Amino acid sequence: MTQNVDRETVVSRLLAADDILILCHKNPDGDTIGSGTALCLALQQLGKNAAVLCSDPIPAMYDYMPITVFDGSFRPAFVVAVDVAGIQLFGERNNIQEYAEHVNLCIDHHGSNSGYAYETLVDAGAAAAAELLTTLIPEMGAKITPEIASCLYTGCLLYTSPSPRDVEES
């Protein structure tokens, strides 16, 4: 059974771990990939060993993101999922199920989150998981670099599906 945790606990857990695997959902969209990559970059900035794993190939439209794809070069001591409301959303490929059944922490914005992780931070009022990370990353002591900002912007922009007029006006 999952335990709902606050932001301070999330920051504490992430700072206490060294070898961190970040899981994204199958058929990855801008929020799961943008959030996962932003968190990975922030953790690496803090000296952590971190990488991202997704069951499905990452679409070419996200090639501009500096994604560190998990290659098995370290043994994850802590597993965090971003933007994944239920265990069935992980998919089957890339041995992801090996890690999906042992998620330490889930950071999500879906009120329908099934509570599969040991600890969960869900803010159903957030537009995207990326929105949560815009404040969690500085709370961890990491700087929001242009690369991290781009990933977070992608997560917020593509998940909320703005109209062409919204993009033009901004």
Feature annotation, model-predicted:
Residues 11, 37-40, 59, 130-135, ...:
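Predominant activation on well-ordered alpha-helical scaffold segments within soluble catalytic domains
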Residues 29, 39, 80, 133, ...:
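Divalent metal-coordination and catalytic microenvironments
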Residues 25-26, 55-56, 82-85, 107-110, ...:
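Fold-independent oxyanion-binding glycine-rich loops
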Residues 162-170:
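Single conserved hydrophobic/aromatic residue that forms the stacking wall/gate
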Residues 21-74:
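Anionic-ligand anchoring segments at beta-strand to alpha-helix junctions in alpha/beta enzyme folds, i.e.
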Residues 110-161:
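Short alpha-helices
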Residues 63-119:
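Active-site cofactor/cluster-binding pocket
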Residues 1-17:
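Positively charged, low-complexity intrinsically disordered leader regions
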